[in-house]
Amino acid sequence: MADDPHNTSTSDVSELVPDNTEPSAANVKEDAETTAARRELKQTTISDKAKRDSAQLSQEDDKSASEEDDNKSDAGEPEKKKPRTSRGLTPEVQLAAPKQEVPKETVASPKKRTHDELEQDGKEEEEKKEGEKPSSQNRAERDEPEKKRPRDRQASLSVERDGQKEVEPLSAQESRPSSAEKPKIEEKKDESKDTKVDKPQTSSSAFANSSMAKFASSTTSPFGAFGAAAAGKTNLFGLPATSSNIFGSKSADASAAPAGPPKLSFGSASAASPFASLNGQAGGMSSLFKSPFASAFSGGSSALKTAGATGFGKPGEPLKTGKSAKPFGAPESDEEDEGEGEEGEENKSENGEGEEKEEEEKEEKASGEEKKKFKLQKVHIDDGEGNETTLLSVRAKMYVMEKGVGWKERGAGMLKVNVPKQAVEVEEGNQPDADSFDPAALDDAARKLVRLIMRQDSTLRVILNTPILPAMKFQVNHKLKAATVLFTAFEGGEARQVQMKMSQANATQFSNMVEKIKEKLAAA
C-alpha cells in the first residue's frame, strides 16, 4: 500500500518523525492538551508528504503518456486507451505573467472604419475648408461675429517711414497680397484688357442725319404734323374738318351744315345706314353717339319727342299730388279736417273691433282654464265627536300586549279625554272647565261617552276607543327620559292591556285628570 496517499502506517510515521522529537513518557509527563497538539502535528506532516508524492506521480504519468503518444504517432499505430492504475491529483496552477500578443497587421475593409478614423477624416475636411475659405475684411460678409483674438495674435509689423516706426494693422497685412500672388493678379489684368470689345461711339452728325432730328427741330409737337396734314379733310367718323372733337361735339360755327347721312359700305349705294335715322332727326346735334333718350332730359328735339312721348324728368313741370297747392304756413281747410276725422273714426272702429276680439279670446282662455281646474268644496265630516268636549289632549305612543309576541306598537297620536257637552261648563274662549264636570245629569247611555279616544297621525284612524270606568286602574311608571301609563282597555267586549308612552309631565297631568273623573263617576 505504498501508492496509497492516505496510508498512515507506523512505518511511515517513524520515517518522517525523528526519534528525538518524541520524548519518553518516563522522562516527561504530558497533559491532555499537549498530547492532542502533538498528534495533530503528526497528521499534518503526513498529509503534506502524501500530497507531494501524489503530485510527483501525476507528473511522471503525464510524461510517460506523452512519450508513448509520440512513439505511436511515429509508428502509425492507433492509440489505445490505457487504464489508469492510480488516480492522480490535479496539479497546482502556476500563475505567470501573460505574454504580450502582437496583433497581426490586417487590411481593414473600406466599408468598416473605426470611430477614430472617421473623426480624423472629418477634422481633415474641416481644415481643408478653412484653408480654402477666403478671409473677409468686412464684418457683414462673415458668417459669425469676429471673436476677440489673444494679445499675442494682435502683434503687428512695424514699418519705418521717414525714420519713424509705424504700426501696420493686422487687417491691412491680411488684405495686402503676397509677393507670390502679385504676378498672378497682373496676368489676370492683362487678360481682361485684351478681352475688352470696342463699343460704338455716337456723334452729333450721325443724329442730324437720322429721321428723329426732324421732330427735334420743329417747334410743334411731333403729333401736330399729322393734324396739319389732315386739315381740310373730313373726319374719320364723317364729321366736318372744322370740328376738333372726334365725337361730334357742337361746332363753334353755327352756319356749318351737318354732314349727310352715312352710307353703307356694302349693298346698294343709295341705301342709307339704319343708324342715320336717329342722328338725322336731331336738329343741330351732330354727335354720332347721341342717345334718343337724351332729348327727354335736355328738352331738345328727338325722335321720341316728335312722337309725343314725355320723360319723367321734364324740367319745369310741378309735382302733382291729390291735394290742392297752398302757400307754406297756411291753415288747413275744413274739408281736410273732415277727411282726417273720417279716417280717424275708421281707424278707431278697427282698433275697437280688435280690442273686443282680444277680450273675447282672453275670456275663452280663462273659462277653459277654470274648467280644467278642480272645484274643491268644503265637506263636513262627522267624526262622532260633535256632541263631546275634550278636557285633556296629550301626545303619546300606544303599545298593545299580544299573546305569544309581547308588546306591539299600534301607532302614535293624540290621546284625548272626552265628556258630553251638557256635563261641562264652558269658560271664555270656548275652553271647558274640568272642575265643573257633573255626571249626575247624565243617563246610562251618556255615561258611556266619558271615554279615552286616540287617532293615528296623518291617517286619523281610530286606534283606541274605551270608556272610563270607576273600577279602572291607571299605573304610572316614571323612567329617565319618559314615563309609561299602564291600564286595561275594553275593545269589542274584550279586555286588553294597553301601555301609553309619553313625557313625564304629560303622564302626571293625564293621571290627575283621569283620577278626578273616576271619583266623580263613583260619587254619582
Curated annotation (Swiss-Prot):
FG repeat windows: 223-224, 226-227, 237-238, 247-248, 266-267, 312-313, 328-329
SUPFAM superfamilies for the chain: PH domain-like
Bridged cysteine pairs (disulfide): none
Location of the region described as Disordered in the Swiss-Prot/TrEMBL record: 1-219, 247-284, 300-371
UniProt keyword list: Coiled coil, Membrane, mRNA transport, Nuclear pore complex, Nucleus, Protein transport, Repeat, Translocation, Transport
One GO cellular component term: nuclear pore
Comp. bias intervals (Acidic residues): 332-345, 352-362
Biased composition (Basic and acidic residues): 28-80, 114-168, 179-199
Coiled-coil parts of chain: 111-133, 345-376, 503-524
Domain RanBD1 intervals: 377-475
Task of the protein: Functions as a component of the nuclear pore complex (NPC). NPC components, collectively referred to as nucleoporins (NUPs), can play the role of both NPC structural components and of docking or interaction partners for transiently associated nuclear transport factors. Active directional transport is assured by both, a Phe-Gly (FG) repeat affinity gradient for these transport factors across the NPC and a transport cofactor concentration gradient across the nuclear envelope (GSP1 and GSP2 GTPases associated predominantly with GTP in the nucleus, with GDP in the cytoplasm).
Quaternary structure, from the entry: The nuclear pore complex (NPC) constitutes the exclusive means of nucleocytoplasmic transport. NPCs allow the passive diffusion of ions and small molecules and the active, nuclear transport receptor-mediated bidirectional transport of macromolecules such as proteins, RNAs, ribonucleoparticles (RNPs), and ribosomal subunits across the nuclear envelope.
Annotated protein name in UniProt: Nucleoporin NUP56
Organism: Chaetomium thermophilum (strain DSM 1495 / CBS 144.50 / IMI 039719)
Native organism taxonomy: Eukaryota, Fungi, Dikarya, Ascomycota, Pezizomycotina
